[in-house]
A protein has these predicted regions:
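Conserved small/polar residues in nucleotide/adenosyl-binding loops
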Residues: 119-124
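Short beta-strand scaffold segments in enzyme catalytic cores
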Residues: 30-38
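Short acidic/polar active-site loop segments enriched in Thr and Asp
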Residues: 110-111
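Mobile, glycine- and charge-enriched loop segments
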Residues: 71-94
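A short, polar/charged loop-to-alpha-helix boundary motif
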Residues: 46-66
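Short hydrophobic alpha-helix segments
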Residues: 42-44
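Short, basic/aromatic recognition patches
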Residues: 5-28
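Local cysteine-cluster metal-coordination motifs and their immediate loop/turn environment
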Residues: 93-106
């Protein structure tokens, strides 16, 4: 069972990485997928809010304050649909920050799988790293 789960984890992480390539952010491209019962119910990548110019960094190459993280974008898509994150798995290319970890918990996501550890938090400790 574990090897089959690991096989799917790797496949979904590859897809999350490809999704992250859609980001307009220059410094870091992050992608996220929310999967429930082996079905992708949402996706997201880091970027500016809808209707804003797709420039994520300022003149000094710092990320602008209003840029949304991939996890937040994916969770917000589910919130505006008929789906629910309850019991789902989040696949993301970068470990969630503390604010996203709170959103993940509140959304009912029970498992987080990520590629790279950037942020450390109690929520990240509960994650499965592939």
């Amino acid at each position: 069972m574990k090897s089959k789960e690991n096989k799917y984890d790797k496949a979904y992480l590859k897809m999350a990485r490809e999704w992250g390539n859609l980001s307009y952010c220059e410094r870091r491209k992050v992608g996220a997928l929310i999967v429930k019962d082996r079905m992708i119910i949402s996706d997201g990548y880091n970027g500016t809010p809808t209707g804003m110019e797709n420039i994520c960094e300022d003149e000094e190459n710092y990320t602008k304050w209003y840029v949304l993280h991939a996890e937040a974008n994916a969770i917000m898509k589910v919130a505006s649909s008929t789906q629910s994150c309850s019991g789902a798995t989040l696949y993301v290319t970068l470990s969630p920050c503390k604010d996203c970890s709170k959103l993940i918990y509140q959304a009912g996501i029970v498992r987080v799988v990520y590629i790279c550890l950037l942020y450390t938090s109690d929520a990240a400790d509960e994650s499965c790293r592939v």
